[in-house]
């Protein structure tokens, strides 16, 4: 239940006690990946139709993104022959679950945080900015740069494997959601720093809080003491968890409809 819902709850204090073999770690990785893909993936695969291939386009992009990360990690990062643990950390990061093993390399922390921020599918239990948003913004940015060199040429904002063109209004929403994330990250980091938590821990904890990801050893926050936090600190951590899950952009759109009906 914890894995399906992208939760990080464990029946024991350390996950190492539950999965001690490489096979079990690989199996755990693939089960966590399920929450990275769309909730409708199983349905779309069962009732597959060539006319409805566009419904699988986001998941195909996610699969390519996942395979690139796994291949890169296996070739370049598997220096200590602990790839199963790295695979668990990758699966846990992209699905915003956050659990990891104690032998996960600490020098890969930046990569894990980037994957946590990117997140997974629009229609998944994971959090993050979402892969398609990132791809759409990259495509739009490249087209804008190319339009200055070849102004007479028409450029499409279609993302690879997606038939529909990304509208300018959607691009604006995607960009605005990233701005909101940056502002939220800055505010929460500032609040945590004012609560006498050092800047590094405040910054890491802010990312994980906004992205609804459990802190663990791969983020070097496994020993962070939440119990002794002040009431106000716990309250605004909860508030930013809700903002990260619901997305502040959605809340602003709802308020706009109520406040500016005309």
Where are these regions (language model features)?
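Membrane-proximal intracellular helices of multi-pass ion channels
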Residues: 1-262
